Amino acid sequence: MEYSYAAYVPALKALADETRLKIVDMLSCGELCACKILESFQITQPTLSYHMKILCDSEVVTGRREGSWMYYRLNPDKRQWLFDFLAEITSTKENCICFN
């Protein structure tokens, strides 16, 4: 199968950070307020905003504002898209890139 590998780079780069991976792990339990996420880290609110922007820009996470609070959750469509891609490129197959 032919892939546009560049399409996967933003999401994979977003996940290539220890703090952002922990945030994704936390969000696997469900939607969380930014204030709850912040309680789990030794970082400032602007630093959390930086990480959340990267996760949201890559569409791994979605955010919604409720009053003055931001709530975040995993994007299930992007999650499945990444799972499918990683499963495909790591599986043994006849049309493997190395045989083309």
Where are these regions (language model features)?
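Amphipathic alpha-helical dimerization/coiled-coil segments
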Residues: 1-7, 77-100
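N-terminal helix-turn-helix DNA-binding core of bacterial DNA-binding proteins
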Residues: 6-46, 66, 70-79
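Core alpha-helical elements of the protein kinase catalytic domain
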Residues: 13, 25, 52-54, 94
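Functionally engaged cysteine thiol sites
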Residues: 29, 33-36, 58, 91, ...
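Alpha-helical residues within the helix-turn-helix
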Residues: 39, 50, 56-57
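Short alpha-helical linear motifs
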Residues: 47-51, 90-91
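Short, isolated positions within intrinsically disordered regulatory regions of eukaryotic proteins
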Residues: 54, 73-75, 85
